[in-house]
A protein has these predicted regions:
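N-terminal basic/disordered segments at the start of proteins
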Residues: 1-26
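Helical "lid/coupling" subdomains associated with nucleotide-phosphate turnover
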Residues: 3, 17-20, 40-64, 68, ...
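Ser/Thr-glycine-rich phosphate-binding loops at phosphate-binding pockets of nucleotides
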Residues: 10-12, 79, 124, 141-147, ...
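Hydrophobic residues embedded in beta-strands of well-ordered beta-sheets
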Residues: 13, 25, 145, 154-155
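N-terminal glycine-rich anion-binding loops that anchor highly charged ligand groups
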Residues: 24-39, 66-69
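Conserved beta-strand/loop subsegment of P-loop NTPase cores
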Residues: 73-76
Length: 312
């Protein structure tokens, strides 16, 4: 069966088309576009017309790929930004029009933070060594961060309403961020993590797995890549000291300096400092609570979990 997943988050819209056989996936096409659907949502509570238009353009291109590859089933999920807005009906109507032209009846669905966490976990653990379990899987998005503990199943999860876009819009207004802005952002992250780690007992974890664009970009920079190489990133490992060094470097840079880095995806340079601050705080907590001082980065994530869910 050829199945597809579309994940529309606060910062990016992503597509996976895969062949599914006996519960295993073979990638046919995987793509990410930065559309910033959630731009300004934290302040206004509404999707901006320009953000809807950018998302429509990307989704139209994705629909063409679904048709070209003969996709039989597709599931599109919308996450943090869509949970928070009052005009989501405009978004739903757009997705129904674009996707429905290829797969009749297809439309985006808003999933809860709990389901987002479970799908991310399911997608991430497929190729991990079970001897390294339990895993704490962290999906750091634009508007929310999912923290999940488990081995062959989810033991505990929490969706925190903080991510690289939301943190940047709330706290990091200067270029580069001032020390005062950085400290304010750290306080916000610590407040959210205090709650999350009261629910998810990360001290039981043996391995930390990071998902999504902030994590993958940090790994690329830690490994001194001049261009982004997804095959090399998948299941790459970053020692804690290297991770913190890259985070500090990014936080101190201007947006233009970050944008000039070879592995930096277009549209991520203005928000990755917020993601780096969150990763630093996570790294410190996991080292203190669980003795974990290494990050494993996976390219397989919620998209893989969504495809598995739609393929049955």
């Amino acid at each position: 069966m050829t199945a597809a997943a579309v994940d529309c988050g606060t910062n990016s819209i992503r597509l996976l088309i895969a062949e599914v056989s006996d519960g295993r996936l073979r990638d046919v096409h995987r793509e990410t576009r930065i559309v910033r659907l959630g731009q300004g949502v934290d302040a206004t509570g509404r999707f901006a017309p320009d953000a809807i238009a950018r998302t429509r353009t990307a989704l139209t291109d994705y629909a063409s790929l679904l048709r070209a590859h003969g996709v039989e089933r597709v599931r599109m999920v919308a996450t943090s930004a869509a949970r928070d807005v009052t005009n989501r009906d405009v978004f739903f109507a757009m997705t129904a029009e674009v996707l429905g032209a290829v797969v009749p009846g297809a439309v985006a669905e808003v999933i809860t933070g709990t389901e987002e966490a479970e799908l991310s976990f399911r997608g991430a653990i497929g190729e991990l060594d079970s001897a390294a379990a339990p895993f704490v899987v962290v999906d750091l998005g634009g508007g929310s961060t999912e923290i999940v503990l488990g081995g062959d199943r989810v033991v505990a999860s929490y969706s925190a309403d903080i991510g690289c876009v939301r943190l940047t819009e709330r706290c990091l207004h200067s270029d580069p961020p001032t020390p005062e802005e950085v400290e304010t952002a750290r306080r916000v992250v610590r407040e959210r993590l205090d709650v999350a780690l009261g629910v998810v007992p990360v001290e039981e974890a043996r391995s930390w797995v990071g998902l999504a664009g902030t994590m993958t970009t940090l790994s690329a920079l830690a490994h001194n890549m001049t261009t982004y190489d997804s095959a090399a990133i998948h299941l790459s490992r970053v020692p804690g000291s290297d991770l913190l060094a890259v985070c500090e470097r990014l936080i101190g840079m201007t947006r233009s300096q970050r944008a000039a880095l070879g592995p930096m995806h277009e549209g991520r340079a203005d928000v990755i400092a917020g993601g780096a601050i969150e990763v630093e705080e996570l790294a410190c907590e996991l080292r203190t609570r669980a003795g974990i001082d290494e990050l494993i980065v996976s390219e397989h994530d919620i998209l893989d979990g969504i495809v598995l869910s739609v393929a049955g």
